[in-house]
């Protein structure tokens, strides 16, 4: 779907409590998948693919892409496919990749199983919300091998979306967004092994909206890396994960205007972890709002001397203009690992940090106390020092023995009771319909055509979307008008090329507005793992 920004005047007049968006402009593909499919549909079955879990999908997928790369839709129908040679799909324009089947890794090369690069106006999706990649990473991990392939990588892709898709058990990372622009990623489930180095979503890009995603692993949940600008991360369910973070940050770090909102973290290493060791550059204008956590080792953690990362030299990465707002819940052991730990570089103290409405408490009934610790950090709240003379200082720690008011927070019914280990096949999950307590996903799953999705208050008025009947053949796609629609989606049949912004996913059409946010003026024992 295409998301369009509104003017600041419109935002302020319609929703006074919201300020300028973290995003800098429109995100998503320029044309719908049905339009692409009507131009041309390239079904991999017509290029030699077989849904027999044995025949290599790689060559048929590459051939189908070659025929549709200049405008069209590449279609992988339902069924089980083997991928033994990786697919590098480069130079596409106005194209879509619809994967309704399950792709199983059968090859052993490194690199990326599906690598999409130098493309524009692109969409990857499953019309059934059940298309998946199964990496079978346990076949590596049970032998303590961690250098296998990644599942999905986008590089230098503009005006794109990835949605209604499932990634399971990567031998290495699951999903990377590398130097991409104007993208939207949503309605996904990512499930990996319980070990470091099996990242969920890594993003170093510009103007990208990531929302409504569940991640299970033991490393990065959704993590921003450098360089990145104008990234909005919302409605994220870190369900037995490593947790969200930024980094590792090193030399010439360039990160700004990042918002994390509505982040639910269960039984993970941390709720938000900003990690570095030396380095240079800066990360500024960061908002971490509406976080709920339970059973996590760390809550908010800035570690500028992270021991799992080799020193990068330099005075350190300068962190500034950071706001934490509305954090609730519990941590595993507040006496050992307090909910606020901020360690900034001696050579580049952090400043303009604001911590407000932060209430968390320990789950350790035998030691009813917790601490807050700050070093070289300036701002307002808890252990932060005030003042404009930002000089280095030794850590100051405050210990409290009574629970703060208002710390109690909701849990999620789907909170996992155990991890998936690293020695057995991990089952393919279904994409959930809830990612944060009380928050409705922005877009209904494509499999739930008649369901309702939440509409932000900021939406351009328009007539309802007109939906034409879909046919059952891949080449004859349905059409729809590209106007914003009311909250209730219109039901329709599923067919190749039917995509968000039409009838299957987002009910808003191409006039949907950007959500807004204030512009800030290892294992069960929680072992940390170093990589990147």
From Swiss-Prot:
This is Probable rhamnogalacturonase B. GO terms for cellular component: extracellular region. It is found in: Secreted. Residues 521-532 have a biased composition (Basic residues). Belongs to the glycosyl hydrolase 28 family. Its main location: secreted. The active site is at residues 219, 294. Its EC number is 3.2.1.171. Glycans are attached at residues 239, 321. Residues 1-21 form the signal peptide. Residues 466-475, 490-499 have a biased composition (Low complexity). Residues 466-532 are annotated as: Disordered. Pectinolytic enzymes consist of four classes of enzymes: pectine lyase, polygalacturonase, pectin methylesterase and rhamnogalacturonase. Hydrolyzes alpha-D-galacturonopyranosyl-(1,2)-alpha-L-rhamnopyranosyl linkages in the backbone of the hairy regions of pectins. One of its GO terms (biological process) is cell wall organization. GO terms for molecular function: polygalacturonase activity; rhamnogalacturonan alpha-L-rhamnopyranosyl-(1->4)-alpha-D-galactopyranosyluronide lyase activity. It comes from Aspergillus oryzae (strain ATCC 42149 / RIB 40) (Yellow koji mold). Disulfide bonds join 42-68, 221-238, 344-350, 374-383. InterPro entries: Glyco_hydro_28, Pectin_lyas_fold, Pectin_lyase_fold/virulence. Keywords: Carbohydrate metabolism, Cell wall biogenesis/degradation, Disulfide bond, Glycoprotein, Glycosidase, Hydrolase, Polysaccharide degradation, Secreted, Signal. It catalyses: Endohydrolysis of alpha-D-GalA-(1->2)-alpha-L-Rha glycosidic bond in the rhamnogalacturonan I backbone with initial inversion of anomeric configuration releasing oligosaccharides with beta-D-GalA at the reducing end.
